[in-house]
Amino acid sequence: CNTAHAWRDEIVAAVTIPFISIIDESVAQAVASADGAIGLLTTPGCFKAGLYQQAIDTASRELVAQTEAELGETMQLIDRIKAGDKSADVEKGLRAITQQLVERGATAIIAACTELPLVLNQTMVSVPLTGSTDALAKKTVALALAEEPLPES
């Protein structure tokens, strides 16, 4: 869950292993995929916590945020995915929201919810799509294979 990163400091303090941030890895991958503004497809809770906004700002990129209505619709679609609904109707809803982000200037999109990749994929989006789960998995594998040094906690 991306929103769990709201407790990042507490998690890092409670464990002795390196902490890999799904937020940092997703933003790094999105930044590498396109030169312009980054669209954020997320839940209301994650958005209100400001987790991605801060990381995107640190990367010196503009954020294309969802409207309140889009956040609500995204949450409804995520709830449907959690209930096992991977229908064309859910796909259509996600396509519409991502297209709105593109129309407002997003040159890349971060799918910042671990349920989204169960339905949303690159073929559905006209700009580079970074799935937060995939970004975290890629970094974890690179660290496990010692292709990159472990992060400092």
Predicted segments — roles?
Residues 1-153:
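Non-catalytic structural scaffold of enzyme domains
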